[in-house]
Amino acid sequence: MKEKLEKLQEVIGYQFRDPGLLTHALTHSSYANEKHWDKTRCNERLEFLGDAVLEVISSDFLFHTYESMPEGEMTKLRASLVCEPTLAYCADVIPLGDYLLLGKGEDLTGGRKRPSVVSDAMEAVIGAIYLDGGLANAKEFIHRFILNDIEHKQLFYDSKTILQEMVQAKYKETLVYELIKEEGPDHNKSFEVCVKIGDEEIGRGLGRTKKAAEQVAAYHGICKIQYGTDHVVLRNRKINACI
């Protein structure tokens, strides 16, 4: 685990003075439960803190970057940048899921790629960096991995609307979303959806809701139409999401 932590710190560009904070941020509740640890030893409290830090930093960034943007538009843009789907997208760039401490069941059922798990861990890492190195270091991490390439993230966030407009302009066939698979208990559902133009599949997506899975499928569909492949994303990594 020590080697993995060192590698992760190289990837994110921050060296922890207290590596235990990073381990804490990577500890999912399923792992803590499996070890019969106290609930405070999982990453949920750090996630809570990181969420607050992320909101402050992203708000400050938008306020100073888009000086003529009205409050309502800034609110919408911030929501698109810090929502669970986008955070899962950003976490996959690292890829953060590879470093998580998960319970065996969570790991076997795809927890390392589950959007809710990796997006929560992303916020927990922000919280850990804030505690270890202060607001400036947390800000640097957020700018590097979340507030970069905003236009691309906006495309992801608005993918269903954009794909609909593209298909209406270029094709005669109807755009259709089909549910491929639904699994998991009611409190932790997972959906897989494909999107088709007529009978031709152009993208697939996973998510905790059908709407979220459709969003990811639409994004992959846009990439397929524009670039001929369904996974042209930031740093060429596939994404999954949920909202």
Where on the chain are the PLM-derived regions?
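Double-stranded RNA-binding/processing signature
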Residues: 1-243
